[in-house]
Amino acid sequence: MIISEKIYLTEDKKASLEVIGLPMFDQSRSAWQAEERPVAVIVPGGSYLYCSDREAYPVGLTFASKGYQVFILRYHVGDESDYPRPFLDLSLAVKYIKENKEKYKLDINNITIAGFSAGGHLVGTYAGLVNRKEFHEISGMDQDQLKVKNIILGYPAVNLKPIAEKINHYNIHDKVGKLFTTYDEIKDGKALAYNGMANVFVFHSIDDDMVYVNEVADYVHHLTTLGVNVEFHLFNQGGHGYSTGNKFTNPKEGFPTRVGVWMDIAFDWLDSLS
């Protein structure tokens, strides 16, 4: 049986957490079941115009099947998507999770946040913001309260400068939320990265025509120069927005099935860090 509930993080109800997971089993009857579950926060993309269900529930349910307690974040988008609003939404999500560890039986020392496309930008940038004093001040939280153990970035728009330049060059401001229309270092995941940030897992495809491969490779290279613990997987085909990359999200349309192995690789990576 899947338990699902919705927690509003802000008074306007535009940021929320959906809780998805399995009930805790009787310890005496299921000795294999850990008392505390690792946590996965899923942050879907949608160009900061909307939050994609395709990158929310299929990924979340797959994490739940691996024993994770899953939380799906819905954050401010559109004209309300610029810094700092979505990052504050994520900080409130992390705060809620850590403050409710007993309610959900959570291992709050083993939190992974997975973001896709624009959600990958949000997550990658947040991972850098946890080290910035100005973000501590506006969030009311310190680095220890904000930080999580791992982040997973799927075809992420995390390298903001070339993305903002493309949007302005082609005048496609109506195709994205406000955050992507201007550049500022404070909302650039590459510029904010630092030695000691969360462990990073990145996957991408060479033929992605929305977030170019060189933009992601440049971000990963920058992490390596800083000494960040990063793992990078680059697929020959996949395009953009494939979520789980299997029949869970692509039941009829043709797609490069090999990209779906990213989840198996990611779970193996997470296990290696535990």
Description of each model-found segment:
Residues E36-G45:
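Short beta-strand element of the alpha/beta-hydrolase
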Residues K95-I167, F180, D184:
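Primarily recognizes the serine-hydrolase "nucleophile elbow" in alpha/beta-hydrolase
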